[in-house]
Amino acid sequence: MVKEQQVHDHGFVRLIDIMGDDNSIADAARVSYGEGTRSVSDNRNLVRYLVRHKHTSPLEMVEVKFHLKLPIFVMRQLARHRTASLNEYSGRYSIMSNDCYVPELNYIQPQSQTNNQGRGDGLSDSWKVKYQQTIREFKDKCLTAYDFLLGNESVAHGGLTRELARTVLPVSNYTECYWKIDLHNFFHFCRLRMDDHAQQEIQDYAKVMYEMVKPEVPAAAEAFEDYIYNSVNMSRMEMDALQYAMKSFPDMKTYIKNLKNAEDINFGLSKREWKELVEKLK
């Protein structure tokens, strides 16, 4: 099995292998009480039950393995998911690629004024072009410096060692890795990295990876979307505010309009939590 799709200018996602399927999850769950495989519909219902009630061990019986080419700054976010096994291309042993990520103009935005780790909007096209050109010029200078440090035949000593020459490369430089993870933790990765709050570049990779895995475990993927990815979690304070709304207002639309009045009641929610609650109720 090999599925491949290009991502961005020089990257790609390849689904190299997958061990197990929906039936593997159901079989692993049923071994707890000694019953064998049942029908597909029974298996689907069981898988949905497992995901809904957070019985995660059976999902760990399925594993997926990818070959990825991605910018170093995206690789750093991927490596944060420590339950995965990975092996990365080595700049000590080999010469790094000349490929560097240059964002498309529609990806170039100013820093958000409300989110310290996100992008805003409203940047003019002229500034987008200037920023893109600066990124492109800087990566060209870095690659030129890298080539110089590596040396050539005219340098008697053969150039600087690879492990030090690579230090001038930008985090936009592309690297490659093999990445293997069980399905439970893969879904956790997808929930975080496909979220709108994640950096757009890691979102792009995560969405491609998920769409490749989805047809291989349709029941588990359906349950993930229903009970995890598209679900909404409520805190105790949010539930208190919601119960207040149901008792005090005829409908949710009226409650949202009058939410400022409800905010005067001490539910223990910060201003940001109030804003998040409104978004959940819309």
Regions found by a protein language model. Give the residues of each.
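Family-specific signature for flavin-dependent thymidylate synthase
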Residues: 1-282
